[in-house]
């Protein structure tokens, strides 16, 4: 196989593979993408999303019982303005912004601060900062990549506020890659028509979390580590009013009363949906989804999940090891057993993942 790949390399370098048309993409995805495997889904048995389909692993989590007893004393151990649950990128940013606005903040995380998917991200993040780019173009690229199913308001906020967030991160101390002229260096990312990928070498998430973690500690934001949220609390109106945490060190419950609760608990990769390996960190088990569901929140887009196209498959101990999109951005090829390319490596992730499964 090594010889086949090596012998085809020069010819592959001269190839330009077109991206698929909308019709070709839809046909490919419906036939091969894991989101379209009917046997992997079942209806949720009860709750706000009763009868709606989701993967079996998530449905089981949503239907799980509360781990706390009904007569647990709810006298608060902490009273705060804002409780942030989750210590990754989103949790740290939420805590910092709330703190800046004068709120009394408590950040609780079930592992250590910064133990998250954020710290493991390698390839970079797409923000329209280049002179030939714009938030409008970023919006259109993302809308196309999402098959027009995106929440337009959320997408508009993301692309418009992206440049200011990049500026804020730089002011905090994040060292994004620069070109020889000192300008931000951008790369081509999957599904984009412009070079807009901001990177910190191949450890972008680690660099961002280094800075965010330090800032949370420097601002002396109250922090509870190894404190897993196990239940959200509601007031007499049914509004969320805090949470019960489980102190994993001494096995006791901690009650937090809060005027606002922000769930920043990350994804569900460690449920190993449909048996797939994952590069997610060990805390990504869908806790926040279950917490929100039990208090009455309706979940959206439960039938759609992201499957990262490239990761380690062999040897066995490397299964699930992330192979960053940045490798494909720098010109890496995906080839089959005959040494042939079979997809534009920078097409959208659902297209690339489906093409790999097809091969």
Summary of predicted features, one role per range:
Residues 88-90, 112, 203, 268:
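Residue-level detector of alpha-helix initiation sites
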Residues 99-125, 131:
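Glycine-rich FAD pyrophosphate-binding loop
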Residues 127-158:
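Glycine-rich active-site loop/strand segments that organize a redox cofactor
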Residues 1-81:
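Extreme N-terminal leader/targeting segments of oxidoreductases
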Residues 83-85, 255-266, 292:
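Short hydrophobic core segments
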Residues 81-107:
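N-terminal Rossmann-like FAD-binding beta1-loop-alpha1 element of flavoenzymes
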Residues 36, 45-54, 171-252, 257, ...:
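Conserved redox-cofactor binding core of oxidoreductases
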Residues 1-7, 291, 297-359:
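An anion/pyrophosphate-binding glycine-rich loop and adjacent beta-alpha core
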């Amino acid at each position: 196989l090594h010889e086949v790949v090596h012998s085809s390399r020069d010819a592959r370098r001269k190839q330009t593979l077109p991206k698929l048309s909308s019709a070709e993409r839809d046909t490919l995805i419906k036939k091969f993408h894991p989101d379209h495997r009917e046997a992997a889904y079942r209806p949720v048995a009860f709750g706000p999303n009763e009868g709606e389909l989701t993967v079996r692993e998530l449905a089981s989590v949503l239907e799980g019982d509360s781990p706390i007893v009904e007569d647990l004393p709810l006298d608060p151990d902490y009273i705060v303005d804002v409780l942030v649950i989750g210590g990754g990128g989103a949790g740290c940013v939420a805590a910092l912004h709330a703190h800046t606005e004068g709120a009394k903040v408590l950040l609780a995380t079930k592992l250590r601060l910064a133990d998250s998917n954020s710290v493991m991200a390698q390839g970079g993040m797409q923000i329209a900062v280049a002179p030939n780019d714009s938030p409008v173009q970023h919006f259109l690229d993302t809308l196309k990549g999402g098959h027009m199913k995106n929440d337009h308001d959320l997408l508009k906020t993301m692309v418009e506020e992206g440049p200011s967030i990049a500026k804020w991160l730089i002011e905090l101390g994040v060292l994004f890659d620069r070109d020889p002229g000192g300008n931000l260096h951008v790369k081509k990312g999957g599904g984009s028509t412009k070079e807009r990928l901001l990177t910190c070498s191949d450890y972008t998430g680690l660099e961002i979390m280094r800075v965010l973690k330090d800032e949370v500690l420097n601002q002396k934001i109250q922090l509870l580590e190894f404190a897993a949220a196990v239940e959200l609390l509601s007031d007499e109106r049914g509004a969320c009013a805090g949470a019960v945490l489980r102190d994993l060190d001494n096995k006791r419950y901690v009650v937090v009363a809060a005027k606002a609760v922000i769930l920043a608990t990350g994804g569900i990769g460690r449920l190993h949906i449909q048996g797939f390996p994952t590069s997610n960190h060990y805390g990504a088990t869908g806790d926040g989804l279950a917490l929100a569901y039990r208090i009455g929140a309706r979940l959206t887009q439960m039938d759609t999940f992201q499957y990262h196209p490239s990761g380690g498959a062999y040897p066995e101990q490397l299964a699930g090891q992330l192979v960053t999109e940045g490798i494909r951005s720098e010109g890496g090829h995906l080839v089959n057993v005959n040494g042939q390319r079979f997809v534009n490596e920078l097409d959208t992730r659902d297209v690339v993942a489906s093409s790999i499964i097809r091969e």
